[in-house]
Regions:
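Alpha/beta catalytic cores of nucleotide-metabolism and tRNA/nucleoside-modifying enzymes
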Residues: 1, 24-25, 115-121, 125, ...
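Glycine-rich beta-to-alpha transition loops that act as phosphate-gripper elements at the mouths
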Residues: 20-24, 71-77, 93-96, 112-117, ...
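Generic hydrophobic/aromatic pocket-lining and core-packing "Φ" positions
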Residues: 31, 55, 80, 100-101, ...
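Glycine-enriched alpha-helix->loop->beta-strand junction motifs that scaffold or abut catalytic
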Residues: 35-40, 62-64, 84-91, 106-111, ...
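Short secondary-structure capping/turn micro-motifs that flank functional sites
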Residues: 49-51, 78, 99-100, 119-121, ...
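Histidine/lysine/aspartate-rich catalytic loop segments that bind and position anionic ligands
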Residues: 97-139
Length: 211
């Protein structure tokens, strides 16, 4: 896929599933589970040991399928360079460290955190593809609606943080282009327990909203 095709694919599939754990094997099993559930956009965070290896192995597993695999919690240049070893489809920086843009190739889709209108527009003009609004549940859907139906309709937004099942439709109606799902689905305790059937059930409950 081209970069633009990846952006369209991410928006079309709506949910970005985030795997955050300190267990490499658990992260890989979680990835397999999310794929089985029907997830199409999946992120490995830098908290996972050898997360660049996890990204590379995950991409190899699904190379014949339309599934995007990315790197998350990419806080600085060092982590960005490490992530590039896995050749991720996208990179997520939860803050505003524009230094990572110096080492992330232009063909990669980039998400970057923004909490205020000023931060959000700064991201846009820096060339960021999606602004990650976090914690979205605290700001609420009205915050996103005020921007998307107001001065910033051209900014693509990822709503993440506290995105429980019951509020998803409100955020989508408010204009959120993508919804980030981390501990709402791939809960650390479930990964540690090896309860991947529950993770699959949770993932499917969100994905069913797209049917």
């Amino acid at each position: 896929m081209t970069k633009e095709e990846k952006i369209d694919f991410i928006i079309k599939n709506k949910f970005l599933f985030i795997i955050r754990t300190e267990d490499f094997d658990g992260a890989m099993k979680c990835f397999d589970t999310l794929v089985e559930a029907g997830a199409k956009v999946i992120e490995f965070t830098s908290t996972i040991p050898n997360y660049e290896k996890a990204i590379k192995e995950a991409k190899e597993k699904v190379k014949s399928e339309e599934i995007l695999v990315g790197a998350g919690t990419v806080l600085n240049k060092e982590l960005a360079l490490k992530a590039m070893e896995g050749n991720p489809d996208f990179v997520v920086n939860p803050t505003q460290n524009f230094e990572i843009l110096e080492v992330v190739p232009k063909e990669k889709v980039v998400f970057m955190g923004g909490f205020t209108p000023s931060e959000i527009i700064r991201n846009y003009y820096a060339g960021v593809d999606f602004v990650k609004v976090f914690p979205a549940s605290v700001l609420g859907p009205k915050f996103i609606k005020a921007l998307k139906f107001g001065p910033l309709p051209f900014v693509k937004m990822l709503a993440s943080g506290g995105m429980e099942l019951g509020i998803i439709e409100e955020f989508i109606k408010a204009g959120a282009d993508v919804i980030g799902l981390g501990s709402e689905v791939a809960k650390v305790d479930l990964v540690m327990e090896g309860n991947f059937s529950k993770i699959k059930e949770l993932a499917k409950s969100y994905l069913s909203l797209l049917l």
